[in-house]
Each structure stands twice: as structure tokens, then as C-alpha cells.
């Protein structure tokens, strides 16, 4: 029986998690198949990850977008989220979601009733928690990609295979090993010969000259 998600993710133990997800339909992120090229779908995931890391208190330390699945190593930054003001939380949540009018009134100082103020403050904390939630992060990633692919395929139904898998990274050795494992995925799968030629991976992005001055600990941060 699969472990409940709250048993797989325990931020009190570690902030690093290796996430993997596989598609149901064989055509997902493949290159050429049946006369169609789906390579651009891998770019969808990379661009969505960039957007989500600008919104969530979650960094991407390593990633590899494969033909029919992907690997992402994330770091949850609870301290960063704890320091956000109410205005920052509303702005970040509003990147993808509608913020209720009463919260906008709270931010403007227009709420008078204590119950309304308390409700607004409670909602702030709910949003703060969601912005550190791996489940919400993955939901915002995977539902978006599924909608795009289903529209392109002119079909409906499940796009992803069950739940995403999450592996807690508990020490520095495991962190390094996981990053190496993710970085070398395309080479093991024989779809690339070298790290720098591994398309849609964090290792190729780090090696690229334009990224030599970037923070090598996080692909997106």
C-alpha cells in the first residue's frame, strides 16, 4: 500500500526531495512518433518550473525531463516563506490564482469587523503554507501540462500515471548522489552522450557559458 503523502514529506526532517512523475500515454514527451514531434512538451515543463519557483518557496536544485517521465530535486525554503509579508503572499498567490476581494480589502486596511480580520489572517497563513507545499507545487505543474497536452492531442482523461513519487533526501551524501543520478539520466538512457548535450537538464544549463556565473546549487531559485 502506498504511503500517505504526509508520511513521505516531512519538512522537519529534511527540506530536499527527489520527485518523479511518469505519463500514462506513450506519446508524452517523445521526440518523433507517428509523424509528430512532441519535443516542445519538455520545454513546457522547464518553463513551468521557472514560473513556479518564482512563486513558491521551493527551489529546483536539479532536473531532467526525459521522454515519458521527469525527475526534479527540490528544496523547500520554509524560512523564506515565514518572512513574507501579507502583501507578498497575496502577490505570489495571485500569479496563478484569484485572490478573494475580502483579502484585498484587508490588505488595504478596509476591514473593520474582528471576525473578518481574523478570517483574512487565517487565509494568509493557508496561502503561506500552500506556497511551501510540494503537493501544491506539483499540482500546479502537472495539471497545467496535462491540460496543454490533452488539448494538443484532442482528447481527455488521465495524462499522468497515478501519484507522483517523492523520496526524502536526508543527508549530504544522498543529496550529491541524487543530483548525479538525475544529471546522468539522459546518458544512461542513451539519448545523450555527454552532460552538456543532455537537453532539458539542469546539468546542461549549468555547463552552458551563459550560466557560468549562476548559483550552481539551484537551477531555479
Task: Tell where the protein language model's regions lie, with residue ranges.
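Short catalytic/metal-binding and nucleic-acid-binding patches
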Residues: 1-221
